[in-house]
């Protein structure tokens, strides 16, 4: 899940991601959050994780904004950007957003 603390649509989507995570974490669903915050945004990024209740363990950011290495690898040019990755490690769905739970159920 690519996001940033300054991204209002990302922050608005976070409660839904948290809800789906809490519902399916015991069935093999996990979230890997990649923040596109800037170098001077580390404190805001960490605060947003707490404020939004992003309780999963996987949070990373190189604090390089749009020059983020993971964003380049995944071709991310806008956020929020979510990838559902299947059990074989292949990208199954890109940006399911409101359809997240339904798409996830197809993979579990």
What does each of the following model-derived ranges do?
Residues 1, 31-35, 60:
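Short beta-strand segments
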Residues 78-108:
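Thiol-/selenol-based redox modules, centered on thioredoxin-like
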Residues 46-83, 87:
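Short, internal strand/loop/helix patches
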Residues 12-52, 65-71:
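Structural microenvironment flanking redox-active thiols in thiol-disulfide oxidoreductases
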Residues 6-9, 38-42, 67-69, 91-92, ...:
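Flexible loop/turn segments at secondary-structure boundaries
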Residues 5-6, 31, 52, 96:
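A short, structure-level motif marking secondary-structure boundaries and short turns
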Residues 2, 62, 96:
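Small/polar loops that bind or transfer phosphate-bearing groups
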Residues 1-11, 17:
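Short active-site neighborhood of thiol/selenol oxidoreductases, capturing the structured segment around
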